[in-house]
Amino acid sequence: MSTLAPAELVERIWERDPSVWTGHDEAQWLGWLDEPARMRERVDELVEFVSGIDVDDVVLLGMGGSSLAPEVMRRVFRAERFHVLDTTHPTAIRRLEESIDVERTLFIAASKSGTTLETRSQTDYFRDKGGRFAVITDPGSPLAELSKDVFYGEPTIGGRYSALSVFGILPAVSMGIDVVRLLDRAEEMREGCRLEVGNPGLDLGRRLAETTLLRVAGDFGLWIEQLVAESTGKGGNGIVPVWRGGDPADVRLPDPYELGQEFFRWEFATAVAGSLLGINPFDQPDVHAAKDKTNALLSSRGRVPGTELGPEGSLDELLAAATPEDYVAILAFVDPAREPELEPFVRRAEATGAAVAVGLGPRYLHSTGQLHKGGPDTGLFVQVVDDFGDDLKIPGQAYGFKTLIACQALGDFETLRDRGRRIVRVQL
């Protein structure tokens, strides 16, 4: 845990000193500190590309850090013809496909590694339908081979810190957002986060480090949830974002363009909180466990996932064990359009007096999944599944989206159970 004076902590962060955190590879992941100015230099390139295409809709295919900032901007700026697909549920994919003219749509496949299972599956599906593609990825990624329109990210920026990089700014341009104005606001906050006194990022980070349960609300909460949970939830510790209960998150959005400031303020604050908590806020050591389990299930081609459901009594027993220090996480592998149907589970969880979080799968695997496995053992997990709808074939694979999401759900269930987490599985 850092014992540096606040002014020295700020100075050392800007000096890229990894000893501020754990002294390992943190200095390799600080490209976000300078990204607002770098992106200003790329604006003309991005605007020229978007203005040169004639489409009716834009669909972003991505997960986690590659999709959540665009999703927040889509909601805040009310970009009706911009869509984010961050699910593998076949019903949701089919509904999106039926709502657009694929040949009049630009698909943006976004993945830093280029190997994200969900993004590659979605990309293969819509490329087979004849859609036009652009790619956002890091240098050396296999995804770059799929399009002539490739926009490379900065390799020294992790996914959850990439809101103000090309992963956020190209989608913003395609929504018609004035990205110069957005980046100018971010640059103003960047300068504010250099101050020794009255530093907005430092002040927020110090408060975060003293927070156990952080209530995230509204559209911006989706992005905060990933940033905070994945950055701090490790080594048995972490700040737990919740929907009901907890201390309210400090979010300032008097107008939509304040998103530029807030993205940077929260990134800097999370880095500060990581230092004060004595953790590396830029790694995610437990994320791959559920991915590995999913891949093993897909490879086995044995049992059909989705049949191992707990009796109703199991849910009652789980919730009866909740204490005010715990949180209940509703982990729902369901069609996102059915999210309102989760409310009865939320109300039952609230009745225990514990804080409540809700995550849609597989989105949450790239968001709060790290916290669930590596964070404090105060979570009670209720995995909710539906019947996954009618299947859609994934080109080049022996399985379709129905099997994929079923394996993702079962893979996460088994990973949490194997780690001794308290979890039950119920049908919606």
Where are these regions (language model features)?
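Low-complexity, highly charged intrinsically disordered N-terminal segments
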Residues: 1-58, 68
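Alpha-helix C-terminal capping segments
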Residues: 24, 50-54, 77, 126-129, ...
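Acidic catalytic cores of enzymes that act on phosphate-bearing nucleotides/polynucleotides
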Residues: 25, 32, 36-39, 92, ...
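Glycine-rich phosphate-binding loops that contact phosphosugars or nucleotide phosphates
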Residues: 51-194, 246-258
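A structural signal for isolated positions on well-ordered beta-strands in alpha/beta enzyme cores
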Residues: 59, 83, 106-107, 134, ...
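Catalytic-loop motifs flanking and including active-site residues across diverse enzymes
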Residues: 69, 162-166, 224, 264-268, ...
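Structural alpha-beta junctions
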Residues: 80, 129-132, 149, 231-240, ...
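C-terminal amphipathic alpha-helical interaction region
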Residues: 320-325, 360-362, 402, 407, ...
